[in-house]
Regions:
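Anionic-ligand binding patches
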Residues: 14-198
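Single conserved hydrophobic/aromatic residue that forms the stacking wall/gate
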Residues: 1-7, 11
């Protein structure tokens, strides 16, 4: 039989609502870093979303508090084709971590001022790493394709959601209800794939 400790999953705090909704019936008790009492600084110096997710998951899994747990960590961001894939893996740090997303979003819109409609393509990418107690680590990637909107719209979501337009829905991801966004989001897609290995 599996001990309760082995059925715990430790996750970084920032996306807990979405994670708990999607992994609700996966058979694990889902615990955030904060709930587990884990407070460590992690240097994300990978060159890809996958590398950064692995760095985070591995660092957390080595803490005493995460011993015996499966650790999930993600790295995600926005890739804008007209900006050569920027902000990419630097999405959170782009233009400074303390710069409000309202300003970052406007900077992206401004950068695309001369872009033709077909040049406004972009995608949200999420890589999730699962670090297991035996030391193995696996990753899964989720992607959602869209366009950069001409102006921000919507009150839901966070970060770049107000400028990420989904043509098939006629809305930005910030205009979608959270439960609808979770069904199609890059993180949701990556989480659905990672479920298969849990």
């Amino acid at each position: 039989s599996t001990s309760r400790r082995q059925r715990q999953m430790c996750i970084r705090d920032s996306k807990m609502v979405e994670v708990r909704m999607i992994l609700a019936d996966c058979g694990y008790e889902i615990v955030s870093m904060k709930e587990a009492g884990i407070d460590i600084d992690i240097v994300e110096d990978g060159k890809t979303f996958e590398e950064n997710a692995i760095i985070k998951a591995t660092a957390i899994s080595k803490t005493k508090e995460a011993e015996g747990c499966v650790v999930l960590a993600d790295d995600s961001g926005l890739e804008v084709d007209y900006m050569d894939g920027a902000p990419g893996i630097y999405s959170a740090r782009w233009q400074g971590e303390d710069t409000p997303y309202s300003i970052k979003n406007q900077m992206i819109i401004d950068a695309l001022a001369d872009a033709k409609e077909e040049e406004r393509t972009a995608r949200f990418v999420c890589a999730i790493a699962a670090a297991f107690p035996d030391g193995t680590v696996t990753t899964r990637r989720g992607v959602i394709e869209g366009m950069i909107a001409h102006q921000p719209a919507g009150e839901h979501g966070f970060g770049y959601d107000p400028i990420f337009f989904l043509p098939e829905y006629g809305k930005t991801t910030a205009e979608l209800a959270p439960e609808d966004k979770n069904k199609i989001s890059h993180r949701g897609r990556a989480l659905e794939k990672i479920r298969e290995v849990l």
